[in-house]
């Protein structure tokens, strides 16, 4: 049975879900930063998904990346599945701009995470839910 890793649960807020993945927003206001987590138990690598799920993951990742770049006018989309700290398969999608605090370096460890201001987190969640509104997206 699929259960979200407690570290992802603590560091993120749920935006909603697509047919395969839960969509999470990282609680770091420095960047538009989403994480896709395939809703499959005991999976830490993409190759451990069956072929249909691998194809669905690529579709969902591309869908999320394209919508994020359009919404936030990014210069570069950083996508990565590291898993060194949290082994549960999760794929980071970070919109990067030439003016963000870490540019051009990777976001991890570059600057301290910045909490969302009061009310801003809820606004961002609503904004993203609207961005992903489709027949297959289910808001959290």
Predicted segments, located by residue:
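HIT superfamily nucleotide-processing domains
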Residues: 1-89, 93-140
């Amino acid at each position: 049975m699929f259960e979200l890793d407690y570290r992802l649960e603590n560091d993120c807020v749920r935006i909603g879900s697509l047919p395969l993945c839960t969509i999470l927003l990282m609680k770091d206001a420095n960047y538009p930063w989403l994480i896709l987590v395939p809703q499959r138990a005991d999976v830490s690598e993409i190759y451990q998904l069956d072929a249909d799920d691998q194809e669905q993951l690529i579709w969902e990742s591309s869908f999320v990346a394209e919508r994020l770049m359009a919404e936030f006018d990014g210069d570069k989309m950083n996508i990565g599945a590291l898993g060194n700290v949290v082994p549960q398969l999760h794929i980071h999608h970070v919109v990067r701009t030439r003016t963000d605090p870490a540019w051009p370096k990777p976001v991890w460890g570059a600057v301290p995470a910045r909490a969302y201001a009061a009310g801003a987190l809820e606004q961002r969640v609503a904004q993203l839910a609207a961005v992903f509104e489709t027949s297959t997206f289910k808001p959290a």
